Amino acid sequence: MSIPRLKSYLMMFAAVLMLGQVLTAQAEEALPDFTTLVEQASPAVVNISTKQKLPDRRIAAGQMPDLEGLPPMFREFFERNMPQQPRSPRGDRQREAQSLGSGFIISSDGYVLTNNHVVADADEIIVRLSDRSELQAKLVGTDPRTDVALLKVDGKNLPTVKLGDSEKLKVGEWVLAIGSPFGFDHSVTKGIVSAKGRTLPNDTYVPFIQTDVAINPGNSGGPLFNMKGEVVGINSQIFTRSGGFMGLSFAIPIDVAIDVSNQLKKDGKVSRGWLGVVIQEVNKDLAESFGLDKPAGALVAQVLENGPAAKGGLQVGDVILSMNGQPIVMSADLPHLVGGLKDGEKAKLEIIRNGKRQNLDISVGALPDDDVEIGAGTEGGAERSSNRLGVSVADLTAEQKKSLELKGGVVIKEVQDGPAAMIGLRPGDVISHLNNQAIGSAKEFTEIAKELPKNRSVSMRVLRQGRASFITFKLAE
């Protein structure tokens, strides 16, 4: 090989080597370095352990079990064949249940945030600091609706976290969790923000932050940090079919948690605005049925009697498009916005009613402590009426109307093959509206059913066990 050609090969090799080094350096720069963040934030993250005393139902050796409640023949068998030992009085022994979780210090004088489910019903709460010292904690208050709890330990000059703004958090942003999964203190995991504003079943007042950060039992109550080292959420839940982490974790936005903690510190409880409605999502078929251009808003499925919405003129079948200028994209947006108001504050609603836009001003009330439940009543023997939907219906009795807070409607007595069976209607279901029209009686129901359009989504309001929702169906040609 000639010398010029050898030089050419060597230069090409050197160029490739340099390019590889540059690409490696760029890749290293693209990946975040969490070390400084962890060193600065870890001291303010704590382990939380609880103890709870529970009645011990175990039977001591040689002791006669409590046979009360057994059928006579079994009780006689055990009394004949087991040694006659004195029975243990109920509740005279106790066992101790323990649980583990995480938390973080938000003030140098000892206020600690964690999850409600970490400390619920605890008789004793121990906070272990990063230096492994332990402090007894006092429960300042809890808010089960957001799963936030505020604790207080005696201390001075304690390390604290920096609080961020969860509203500024962006999907795709790097985040990091520090906690005690399975009791392993100060374990660090990282990931990205997968989505914002998630709503989970039974958690309508929290717009959760979804991440792919590995969260396991013991992480609950621990902080979720952004890359600035600021807490942007409280790790709260995971979605799993295996019992372990599956890539879906949910954190309570720190803005929500701080608002709750401030109220707990000041009043010992949390106050929220309340409209007094049951709402549901507007899907494509419902949007077509109610004359909307696209699926959006919150459909009012039920208006509670004497509630703020009823007094303010909101009606069943209204679609709420915005509140105080903020659009309702998903139905879950409404509880978040209403919950942020105080008793007596105004909610300016933009709605669609019968295809027309209009505005309502409603003074919100205070969210009751207990959920409102409406009984289903007992079925009466009113005259039946059949129709083209494949259902046999009857008028509601006066008792049913009172129980369900309805002025009219019909109860399904029988479901035959047809559209009703296909959409899952059952005997006992109550229908109050059909094709956006209120139903007064079985006769009216049949008359409206005769005029239903074909090959177009038609809405029907159904109450099952006191719970109302709109469903849609289509009649074929």
Swiss-Prot record:
Keywords: Hydrolase, Periplasm, Protease, Repeat, Serine protease, Signal, Stress response
Pfam families, alphabetized: PDZ_2, Trypsin_2
One annotated Gene Ontology cellular component of this protein: periplasmic space
Reactions the enzyme catalyzes: Acts on substrates that are at least partially unfolded. The cleavage site P1 residue is normally between a pair of hydrophobic residues, such as Val-|-Val
CDD domains for the chain: cpPDZ1_DegP-like
Residue numbers annotated as active site: H117 (charge relay system), D147 (charge relay system), S220 (charge relay system)
InterPro entries cross-referenced by the UniProt entry: PDZ, PDZ_sf, Pept_S1C_Do, Peptidase_S1_PA, Peptidase_S1C
All copies of domain PDZ, residue ranges: 264-355, 361-466
Binding site for substrate: G218, N219, S220, L275, G276, V277, V278, I279
E.C. numbers: 3.4.21.107
Keyword Protease on entry: yes
Major subcellular site: periplasm
Cellular localisation: Periplasm
Signal sequence annotation: 1-27
Listed GO biological process terms: proteolysis
Gene Ontology MF annotations: serine-type endopeptidase activity
Protein family (similarity comment): Belongs to the peptidase S1C family.
Function noted in UniProt: Might be efficient in the degradation of transiently denatured and unfolded proteins which accumulate in the periplasm following stress conditions.
Designated name of the protein: Probable periplasmic serine endoprotease DegP-like
Native organism: Pseudomonas putida (strain ATCC 700007 / DSM 6899 / JCM 31910 / BCRC 17059 / LMG 24140 / F1)
